[in-house]
Amino acid sequence: LLPGAASVHHLTFRTLASARESYDLVVLGIGNSIFQPLLIDDLFEVLNRGKAKVGIFGTQYRELMPRPALDRLIDRLDMWYARYQDDVLMYGRGRGNVEHLGDWLIDQFPIVSPTEAGELHIGDEVWNDLPLDRTIQYIQRYGKVYSTRLHPLLCALTSANEVAYTEQPFDNQPAIVSGKFRSMLIDIFGRSWPEKTWFAVDRDAVIRYKQDVRRNVARLGGRLEAMLRNVAAAPPA
């Protein structure tokens, strides 16, 4: 999405102290979901060093999310490209700097037909052994997929006939769940299903979602290029 000549300095929430004095553009997130422990003062300090600031993330464990801290974060951003429509409705209502992006990882998953009639159960181990492309091929072989992880379920929606899921609880508090599965399903199908309930996949809805996300991502790329051009053309402060 960034111009080919862009020089990128990667930071994680554990390496914020290594931030440089200033940046033309700070991009917060890679399409992932943030939650309460990440809303720290060091994060806001790094954002202050950017001439332009963009967020590409969703939210999770919303019951634990301190609203004032999240509002403060959104206020600092020139644009927030939200992972879910729920994010926009809950935190972006009335704001001019919030747009729905979708989960751009779906563009990595082609629409295919399964070749195995059996049932695949996916847990945390799914990312341990195979390269990403092989993992995708493995998941897409099965016509019936049960997942406790979000992105394997998203992958399965492009191939499986039936899927089911279990939400991700917060630490040892099973009553508090991430909410990501529900938000993703509503974005794609306009509704959600209870945990551990098999449901048929509407492939046409998945295709429409893929197309929408691709258009949104293309528009995001154009916005980032325009931001960098404007920063380069701006007179020194």
Q: What function would you assign to each model-found segment?
A:
Residues 1-237:
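Active-site anion-handling motifs in enzyme catalytic cores
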